[in-house]
């Protein structure tokens, strides 16, 4: 996915998030471990969101494209975010994927809440 394509799908995901009552508080948060596409508040819960798009399913769906290695990078990046933004460090956290599959004119969207996480951290689901 090119940068401009990524920005397009992240904006679409942001609109989906807003339409469901959550608020995006950060976009493209980056640290040495990686990047988190969107960070949102869903009620009192802090949500870290990976956005994916696949035009064709030849190599799997957009949802399936979030590998365990990518999940680990998102988890480590979230820890850095929480360390550097103390106002959010006591909130429960969730890790979601918003996946878009198909051509732009007939794309399907799927928001998988709690797609991955770590059991040993008290604030992660």
Feature roles, as predicted:
Residues 1-27:
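Acidic-basic catalytic patches of nuclease active cores, encompassing PD-(D/E)XK
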Residues 4, 8, 33, 57, ...:
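Residues at secondary-structure transition points
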Residues 17, 36-59, 74:
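Conserved catalytic cores of phosphodiester-cleaving nucleases, focusing on short active-site segments
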Residues 34, 45-47, 96, 110:
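Protein kinase-like catalytic core scaffold
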Residues 64-93:
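Mid-chain, well-packed structural core segment of small domains
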Residues 84-125:
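Domain-level recognition of nuclease-like catalytic cores that cleave nucleotide substrates
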Residues 31-34, 105:
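Short acidic/glycine-enriched loop/turn segments that link adjacent beta-strands
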């Amino acid at each position: 996915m090119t940068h401009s394509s990524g920005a397009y799908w992240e904006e679409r995901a942001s609109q989906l998030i807003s339409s469901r009552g959550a608020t995006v508080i950060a976009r493209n948060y980056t640290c040495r471990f990686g990047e988190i596409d969107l960070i949102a508040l869903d009620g009192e819960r802090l949500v870290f969101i990976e956005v994916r798009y696949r035009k064709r399913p030849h190599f799997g769906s957009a949802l399936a494209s979030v590998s365990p290695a990518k999940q680990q990078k998102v988890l480590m990046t979230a820890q850095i975010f929480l360390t550097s933004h103390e106002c959010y460090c006591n909130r429960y956290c969730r890790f979601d994927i918003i996946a878009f599959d198909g051509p732009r004119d007939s794309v399907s969207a799927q928001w998988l809440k709690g797609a991955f996480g770590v059991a040993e951290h008290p604030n992660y689901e």
